[in-house]
Amino acid sequence: MTAQHTILKIRRPDDWHIHLRDDRMLETVLPYTSRFFGRAIVMPNLTPPITSVASAIAYRQRILAAVPQGDNFHPLMTCYLTDTLDANEIVSGFEQGVFTAAKLYPANATTNSSHGVTSVATISGILEKMQKIGMPLLIHGEVTDPAIDIFDREARFIETILEPLRQDFPELKVVLEHITTKEAAEYVIAGNDYLAATITPQHLMFNRNHMLVGGIRTHLYCLPILKRNTHQQALREAVASGCDRLFLGTDSAPHAKHRKESSCGCAGVFNAQAALSTYATVFEEMNALDKLEAFCSLNGPRFYGLPVNDSWIELHREAVTFPEEIALGDESLIPFLAGQSLNWSVR
């Protein structure tokens, strides 16, 4: 990374966790990612989910067809793990270069996760093969027991599910996605080279007070849910530490406006258009701009065993205002930081 006055030049970043959806939604949101990101790990929780090599290839083709002319963007596909998935399908997809990783959703933990895994024991054969071939496991790390408070579900998952899983499969590469708690940050930083984590813009910039005080701000509602400010501060300190197993994952998850602004609104924040500006803002606030490029552009490729991108982007320290709404056919999206401004723009 080079810095000259108010310009930061960094390797083109990658997004290691994104929801691109499909059809009109895909066509609407993809340009906000493909413009500045070289690659993205694409979540498989469509309806129906991506559980086969054939469906992953077809979805990748739909994504590539929606990439605007002039953008050099490569989607990295994932397989949705289920209790009944054939392990050979996973291995075949990975060896063919179709699947980059496999995603573990605890059943009913988040959007479109009803087909998810009911118990790690049911997929032990798959995990054994993934460990053998070096295929990363991506985890939505929350328990789904209704007796566990929603704000405690990540910490409980680490204690009761993730740690035993890592003991059973010590050389399985694991990414604990969108971490939100002090417990998760400490656990990952204390881990070994087989454990990494992604962190979203919203969990670095906001805490649950921002979502709940003075009125409910539905467009900050996501899963895992925003936590108290002590957890937010722990995440900020974690990225500022320079740990090379923490990297960018926006978890950008668009929903139409009417699906967010309802009596039972959907979980998900569409942040692709503001993500890099947000990360730069947070890293500057933490006096850690020298760590920004590694978080955005270097740590992820290193963990996945992929080359870094050979192109660059620039972040300029100048005000940028984000749109109030984004058209979605006859509907619209309300983006992260709608109508607000930050002091870092991307070129």
UniProtKB/Swiss-Prot annotation:
The record lists the catalysed reaction(s) as: (S)-dihydroorotate + H2O = N-carbamoyl-L-aspartate + H(+)
A GO molecular function term, named singly, is: dihydroorotase activity
Q: Can you supply a Gene Ontology BP term from the record? A: 'de novo' UMP biosynthetic process
Pathway where this protein functions: Pyrimidine metabolism; UMP biosynthesis via de novo pathway; (S)-dihydroorotate from bicarbonate: step 3/3
User: Which UniProt key words apply to this protein?
Assistant: Hydrolase, Metal-binding, Pyrimidine biosynthesis, Zinc
Which amino acids does the record list as binding Zn(2+) 1?
A: H17, H19, K103, D251
User: Could you tell me the EC number(s) of this protein?
Assistant: 3.5.2.3
For the modification N6-carboxylysine, the affected residues are: K103
Question: Gene3D superfamilies, alphabetically?
Answer: Metal-dependent hydrolases (3.20.20.140)
Q: Which residues catalyse the reaction?
A: D251
Mind telling me which HAMAP family this protein's record contains? PyrC_classII
Describe the protein's quaternary organization and the partners it interacts with.
Homodimer.
- Family the entry assigns: Belongs to the metallo-dependent hydrolases superfamily. DHOase family. Class II DHOase subfamily.
The protein's name in its UniProt record: Dihydroorotase
